[in-house]
From Swiss-Prot:
Top-rank taxon, per record: Bacteria
Disulfide pairings: none
GO biological process: L-histidine catabolic process to glutamate and formamide; L-histidine catabolic process to glutamate and formate
Cross-link (5-imidazolinone (Ala-Gly)) at residue(s): 141-143
Protein name: Histidine ammonia-lyase
Gene from which the chain derives: hutH
Species assigned in the record: Bacillus anthracis
Length: 505
């Protein structure tokens, strides 16, 4: 059970919450702050004070005053009208993440909701009632209005949820769990939907997968180095410390550890003086991707604990301030950066695939074919990898450089952060498939070189891989092989745990 405070949630805790189904509870001190902040909202309504989103309309209607008797209807209408999401739903892990992050931001005690609302969100998390949230329709400012409106619907007993492996109406799940829908009161609808939790939840899942994929890329690249009898000197500690990037130094160190007892690597001048960049520059390129990952993690952990709705309430109600913390620009930039960093891992992997299958670049059988000419072997696998990396180049175009005005030009600059976050996740899926192709080719090359000559780590990884796909002894439908390895990498490493050198043993 993880305790939410509004201030301390980490990526590691989100892994447990999203991927292992761990439950949540609220910090009592934080809940007290929620209750105290709510008292401020009640006084604002009682006194008829003009405060945006509490006693006024929204967006362009911010100058329209709302009568006391209409305050509840205002919040209900807000959720109904803003539930304009379209397209396929977010993965269930992402909608679970939205619930967790929305509850966590409310626990900062500046949003003005009743403790009941926070408790309801936590009930959904712990009972695994997850909203069906369409992926498209958010501009990323004022936050993720459309996606979070679909989340808010289920508190009202409306909309759809994922529940016990099925997609059902929210009331089906609430009734089975003995829960009653709630009626939103002043500010609560706005506090539920005005924030960045859709782009951030998708970003968190993307980061978790990206981190593990980056480790996998090092292990697969190490197997390729063996298959091509790469020069180990390029990974010498002195070279990388001379440049000074810690991520580059760390990648080189992990590669050296993986290959320390390999009989397939060569020394400088033994077979050739230098390797091609796709081998020699693995620490420099992969290390740069790790710089991106470290940046993204830092920004996500800030946003996971951020108050992102509007207005915010401070100093016991002395200050009720309309601001713009809902603007998703920080996450939009981070997700666009993640897209570039991960796409490059696929780019360099595809070049290693080419070196494994091109007979002009190695002394392996052409296209790793068992009978070159009669059988094509891995020829079209390289085509598939080339297609994926080209698709990634399109997806990697920054969403955050775009903006379009909305709400009659009141909201005249937006982040497109949710688009960036969604595209980052798509890129990561493509990267994993490219790495799967590289692994299939690297395993085949390793067999040609002699499995007994592989390092302890890569040999173990090879045997695990061969449990998923057999050797290429005849042409067959290789699409199945690629998907099998892809699924194996995702479910055995990127979903469960960080891959380190010893994970393959």
């Amino acid at each position: 059970m993880i305790t939410l405070t509004g201030h301390t949630l980490t990526i590691e805790e989100m892994k447990r919450l999203l991927l292992e189904g761990e439950g949540v509870t609220a910090c009592p001190t934080s809940m007290q702050k929620v209750a105290e902040c709510r008292e401020v909202v009640e006084k604002i309504v009682e006194n008829g004070k003009v405060v945006y989103g509490i006693t006024t309309g929204f967006g362009k209607f911010s100058d329209v005053l709302i009568q006391k008797d209409d305050v509840k209807a205002l919040q209900h209408n807000l959720i109904q009208s803003h539930a304009c999401g379209i397209g396929d739903p977010f993965p269930e892990e992402v909608s679970r993440g939205m619930l967790i992050l929305r509850a966590n931001t409310m626990l900062k005690g500046v949003s003005g909701v009743r403790p009941l609302v926070v408790n309801m969100l936590l009930e959904f998390v712990n009972r695994k009632i997850h909203p069906v949230v369409p992926q498209q329709g958010s501009l990323g400012a004022s936050g993720d209005l459309a996606p979070l409106s679909h989340l808010a619907l289920i508190l009202l007993g409306e909309g759809e949820v994922f529940y016990k492996g099925k997609r059902v109406h929210a009331m089906v799940a609430l009734t089975e769990e003995g829960l009653e829908p709630i009626e939103l009161e002043a500010k609560e609808g706005l506090a539920l939907i005005n924030g960045t939790q859709a782009m951030t939840a998708q970003g968190v899942l993307s980061y978790i997968e990206a981190e593990a994929t980056a480790y996998q890329a090092e292990l697969i690249a190490s197997m390729t180095i063996e298959g091509l009898q790469g020069i180990i000197d390029a990974f010498d500690e002195n070279v990388h410390k001379a440049r000074g990037y810690k991520e580059q130094v760390e990648v080189a160190s992990r590669i050296r550890d993986i290959l320390h007892d390999s009989k397939l690597t060569t020394k400088q001048g033994e077979l050739r003086v230098q390797d091609a960049y796709s081998l020699r520059c693995i620490p420099q390129v992969h290390g740069a991707s790790w710089q991106v990952l470290n940046y993204v993690k830092e920004k996500l952990e800030i946003e996971m604990n951020a108050a992102t709705d509007n207005p915010l309430i401070f100093d016991g109600g002395e200050k009720v301030i309309s601001g713009g913390n809902f603007h998703g620009q920080p996450i939009a930039f981070a997700m666009d950066f993640l897209k570039v960093g991960m796409a490059e891992l696929a780019n360099i992997s595809e070049r290693r695939i080419e070196r494994l299958v091109n007979p002009q670049l190695n002394d392996l059988p052409p296209f790793l074919s068992p009978e070159p000419g009669l059988q094509s072997g891995a020829m079209i696998m390289q085509y598939a990898a080339a297609s994926l990396v080209s698709e990634n180049k399109t997806l990697a175009h920054p969403a955050s450089v775009d903006s379009i005005p909305s709400s009659a030009n009141q909201e005249d600059h937006v982040s497109m952060g949710t688009i960036a976050s969604r595209h980052a996740h798509q890129i990561i899926q493509n990267v994993r498939r490219v790495l799967s192709i590289e692994m299939i080719c690297a395993m085949q090359a390793a067999e040609y070189r002699g499995i007994e000559n592989m390092s302890t780590v890569t040999k173990s990884f090879y045997h695990q891989g061969r449990q998923q796909v057999p050797s290429i002894t005849n042409d067959r439908i290789f699409s199945t092989d690629i998907e099998n390895i892809t699924h194996w990498l995702k479910t055995n490493y990127s979903i469960k745990e960080r891959l380190d050198v010893n994970a393959a043993l």
